[in-house]
């Protein structure tokens, strides 16, 4: 949630080469108009980028499913990750540094560090089973 009226949903795509990735957004299978930022080259010569979709908080909190779809022709990679508002939030994230898209509903990602407006505590379960706990206040989270 970016502010009291707008939510920003994020999709971080990293570890792809060459620099050519397609990202699309859907709300309950209907195309949405998201933004894909310019890719940055990483130290290992692969690339990463961020795509985001802004939606009214009223729509985000109704429980509709939003999906970030990613395809990379160079590696034949195709994947999607769906997100839905979760009050009080326990969420699942890929392991940081992995090659899969990273999202963290109901928040935005900046290096997979959740930044929230309303929640005060957040439990994160990584795909490898690891657990992280965050204490969130004033739109920022710190690991407990």
Swiss-Prot record:
GO terms for cellular component: extracellular region; immunoglobulin complex. GO terms for biological process: adaptive immune response. SUPFAM superfamilies: Immunoglobulin. Residues 1-82 form the Ig-like domain. It is found in: Secreted. Residues 87-144 are annotated as: Secretory tail. It comes from the Eukaryota. Its main location: secreted. Glycans are attached at residues 3, 43, 123. Keywords: Adaptive immunity, Disulfide bond, Glycoprotein, Immunity, Immunoglobulin, Secreted. Disulfide bonds join 11-68. Transmembrane segments: none annotated. This is IgW chain C region, secreted form 1/3. It comes from Heterodontus francisci.
